[in-house]
Amino acid sequence: MENKLLCWWLYWPCVYSSIIATIISFYTITRHLLNYRKPYEQRLSIRILLLVPIFSVSCASGIIKPEAAQFYVDPIREFYEAFVIYTFFTFLTLLLGGERNIITVLSLNHAPTRHPIPLIGKICKPIDLSDPFDFLFVKKGILQYVWFKPFYCFGTLICSAWKLPKFEIFLNVFYNISVTWSLYSLALFWKCLYPELTPYKPWLKFLCVKLIIFASYWQSIIIQGLVVTGKLGTGNQDRTSGYVYKNGLLCIEMVPFAILHAVAFPWNKYTAFSIPYGARMKFIYALKDFLGCGDLIWDFKQTLFAGPLYYNYRNFDPEAMDLLSTRQQSGATMERLKHGLRFTDNGRNSYWVAYGSIDNNLVPESIEESWEDDIAGQRTFPEDPNYPVVHDYTMGHRYSRSMNDLRRDVQSRSSMAC
């Protein structure tokens, strides 16, 4: 049944926009799954692309059945919104070669980065990502929003069901602190490694993630302000009408967001034309890979439970020559020396000195567990030696370097003959 709070000429464009945005996003996701040649990169891209369909469905539900959507659909959207911030951070980390490469190689060439906000800069020391503890601080700052969001959604439902406006105010204050801290930590990471990120043209990807979150957040505040001032909504339905109009506006915006996401995270760079000799996963295994949670569980455990036991100087130990050829007087280098790092062979090698009979800087065996990909761990079926990957030999050979050279040679000879 149509929602009576929206006129038909507003209601149906919102519904159709949600459907169109969902179709665009699922088309892009499907093409990724059919060309699944870089699992570690594409699983993150698909998880980010999935944000638009989730927003589209939840916003459409919000204008069709606002009461039910607030309780059953919105918490899913809220949690996934936070999850995408973490996924985007992981995506940037992957582009730069992983956490170890960032800490032990890339960040050694940078001076510590001052906080962009002067007041914070006077209180907190500059961020040096070559220090594992600083990297952990930034990563936890991003992840805490993901951990906080389920509690926030649960608390919001309790406040709505039991009519607790005062508790809801405090909950919103903590929510704003959490989301601000998360975005600020992501901005710090961005600022520290911007020269290394520039070749990957990250601005479009950054806008995809940030615009949809900012649009949802600030439009909600503006519309709520219009409701409070009496500019929007009448009678006892003020709060519901504000909720419906907010979701209706987001429905319209989902179409350009879907197009923007498809451009920022394209599937065509993973085709046989772009990677001629690269094998791809079958569709069903690609689907299983991006829906799997093994990488998330491992990363959450190492960050939340292991913490400094994993992110310490010994586990993230740069090469001796790299450490000496860069900023020798950096805080991270001096801290490594304090924790037992020593150089030998005129700085060509290094070793660690263990103080006392127990080396308390190493990771316990119960925590240091290697993560195994579910797909990589599958055994090979005798009837299919390429399981679970497929080689597109015909397509790959057609776009190989040798065929391209031959094609250019034929074209040049043809032009000379003419």
From Swiss-Prot:
Identification of the protein by name: Vacuole membrane protein HFL1
What are the record keywords, sorted?
Membrane, Transmembrane, Transmembrane helix, Vacuole
The reported effect of residue 384 to A is: Stronlgly reduces the interaction with ATG8. Impairs interaction with ATG8
Q: Where are the transmembrane segments?
A: 6-26, 44-64, 79-99, 142-162, 169-189, 206-226, 247-267
Mapped to this chain, the residue ranges on the Cytoplasmic side of the membrane are 27-43, 100-141, 190-205, 268-418
What Gene Ontology terms describe where this protein resides (cellular component)?
Answer: endoplasmic reticulum; membrane; vacuolar membrane
Where found? Vacuole membrane
Region annotation ATG8-interacting region: residue ranges?
Answer: 379-402
